């Protein structure tokens, strides 16, 4: 199955980038961190080495880094949800105050 790639104009690329910036919840608190781990964190194969077994220090380190990245991502998403709930309740209060 072949994938069809469409060339995008610079304007379309800019619009996609702006949309991405608006959709991604950028956290500023201590729970926010790197959303994606560095390349190779999930890989059990080290560059230039044979396959790392599941009990090797390399695989344990990779799993620990992946677990840490997942924990940070979850904390960041929970903080974003909490901010959204607070903003929704605040906007609802403002709507009730402005009601005639």
Swiss-Prot record:
It holds the Pfam family TIP39. The keyword NAD does not apply. GO terms for biological process: cAMP biosynthetic process; neuropeptide signaling pathway. Residues 31-59 form a propeptide. GO terms for molecular function: signaling receptor binding. Expressed in testis and, less abundantly, in liver and kidney. Expressed in seminiferous tubuli and several brain regions, including nucleus ruber, caudal paralemniscal nucleus, nucleus centralis pontis, and nucleus subparafascicularis thalami. Expressed in neurons of cerebral cortex and subcortical areas. Expressed in Purkinje cells of cerebellum. It is found in: Secreted. Keywords: Cleavage on pair of basic residues, Neuropeptide, Secreted, Signal. Residues 1-30 form the signal peptide. GO terms for cellular component: extracellular region. Plays a role as a potent and selective agonist of PTH2R resulting in adenyl cyclase activation and intracellular calcium levels elevation. Induces protein kinase C beta activation, recruitment of beta-arrestin and PTH2R internalization. May inhibit cell proliferation via its action of PTH2R activation. Neuropeptide which may also have a role in spermatogenesis. May activate nociceptors and nociceptive circuits. Ligand of high affinity for the PTH2 receptor (PTH2R). The N-terminal truncation of tuberoinfundibular peptide of 39 residues [TIP39(7-39)] reverses PTH2R/PTHR1 binding selectivity, then is a highly potent and selective antagonist for PTHR1. Belongs to the parathyroid hormone family. This is Tuberoinfundibular peptide of 39 residues. The lineage of its organism: Eukaryota, Metazoa, Chordata, Craniata, Vertebrata.
